[in-house]
A protein has these predicted regions:
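Glycine-rich, flexible loop/turn motifs
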Residues: 26, 35, 69, 80, ...
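Solvent-exposed interaction patches of small proteins and small membrane subunits
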Residues: 2, 6-9, 33, 68, ...
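Alpha-helical bundle segments that constitute or directly flank the non-heme di-iron/ferroxidase center
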Residues: 1-29, 50-61, 134-138
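Short coil/turn segments at secondary-structure junctions
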Residues: 1-2, 43, 80-90, 127
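A short secondary-structure junction motif
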Residues: 21, 25-28, 66, 110-113, ...
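Short, contiguous alpha-helical
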Residues: 31-75, 104, 118-157
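Acidic/histidine-rich alpha-helical segments that form the ligand environment
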Residues: 10-15, 79-116, 132, 136
């Protein structure tokens, strides 16, 4: 099995790990922030549901020409202030599943050369399609870890 096959498989199955984790968070904790400026499990989930669109756009950009510039994605001040708490969770998770399935199908069609295609990233020393989607997986697992921390947190005072 190649590295790309393993990566695609992990991306394909990630929603099956993350969504049940989100559903396990008790309703009274779901939107509760652990401290000022830190996201709730709900916000982490909404954020994850929005990520594939940006990474799909980056893929299209990288494949469109030689070494395009990839800008760092920053969270909006509105999101940091709690705007994601107003987004419908069920609709967002449905979107996450749909967009992930579409993204996975697109990734399965990439050639070995396309996986290695490089871009210039403003924050990283080197960047390729493979690195980008490995980064997406790591990003998801980071947020899943944060959700699990909030799920299991004992001391909420």
């Amino acid at each position: 099995m190649s590295d790309t096959t393993i990566l695609i498989s992990a991306l394909e199955t990630a929603p099956g790990v993350i969504i049940p984790l989100i559903r396990e968070v008790p309703a009274d904790r779901l939107k509760r922030r652990p401290s000022e400026g830190k996201w709730s499990a709900y916000e982490h989930a909404i954020h994850l549901s929005q990520s594939d669109v940006a990474f799909r756009a980056r893929l299209d950009l990288i494949l469109s020409g030689p070494e395009p510039l990839i800008k760092t994605i920053e969270n909006s001040p509105e999101d940091e202030a709690g705007a994601m708490l107003e987004v419908d969770l069920d609709a967002s998770l449905d979107r996450y599943v749909r967009e992930r399935a579409s993204l996975v199908e697109r990734l399965k069609q990439l050639s070995p050369d396309e996986w290695q295609k490089e871009a210039v990233h403003e924050a990283f020393d080197h960047y390729s399609v493979f690195i980008m989607f490995r980064h997406l997986l790591n990003h998801e697992m980071f947020h899943a870890y944060r959700i699990e921390e909030l799920l299991l947190k004992k001391d909420w005072d």
